[in-house]
Amino acid sequence: PFILGYGGHTYELFGFRSWTFPCIIFLSNHFNVSVSDAFIANSIGLMGFLGIFASIYGAKYCIGKNRAQVVSNMGMLCFVGSILTAISFWFSFWLALLMLFVYNALIILDSGSLTTGTVVNGDAHDRGVRLALHSMVGFLGGAIGGPVVGFVLDNFGGQTSHLAWFLSFLCLGLGSLVSALTFKYYFFKYKQQN
């Protein structure tokens, strides 16, 4: 489940990173808030920097706990975060920008924990293969995320459509939902076997 969860995680992460700049431009135009390209770039840079600490915190939080359960809960929390972020687009530029920061942190929260879960849940003799598969599934998810957002934007009104941005961020959240549901499925399957 950690490998499939990582695919959902990178789908969401790379989709978010691909489209955050144009999203902030849309929001500033929609709410008539004048911001420079430098402000947007610095905001995105700060999101990335703060994301490092979110990932470290998430990995540290899992120590001594049921990692799979915690990561599943993080996925559900991130899915809710995507919904709240999408809703914030209807209210104000500054609220939406704040929610983009929060959502970014929620996306990255489980990053280290997913990789650690892949490493520790298996035998030492197949660790290299598991990590290779982990990376391949992760990059596949990452390759799909950006185009999915673009597809949603193109088919629901374009980059100037409020509805299109709302739906695109809901679609981003599906990465975390798939991750969380993958873990829930494995929990259910494990309980049936015992």
Where are these regions (language model features)?
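Extracytoplasmic gate region of multi-pass secondary transporters
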Residues: 1-52, 145-146
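Intracellular helix-loop hinge segments at the cytoplasmic ends of transmembrane helices
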Residues: 22, 113-121
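Helix-to-loop junctions at the C-terminal end of transmembrane segments
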Residues: 53-67, 153-154
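C-terminal transmembrane helical hairpin of 12-TM major facilitator-type secondary transporters
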Residues: 66-114
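Multi-pass alpha-helical transporter architecture, strongest
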Residues: 86-89, 115, 158, 165-194
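A late C-terminal transmembrane helix in Major Facilitator Superfamily
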Residues: 122-158
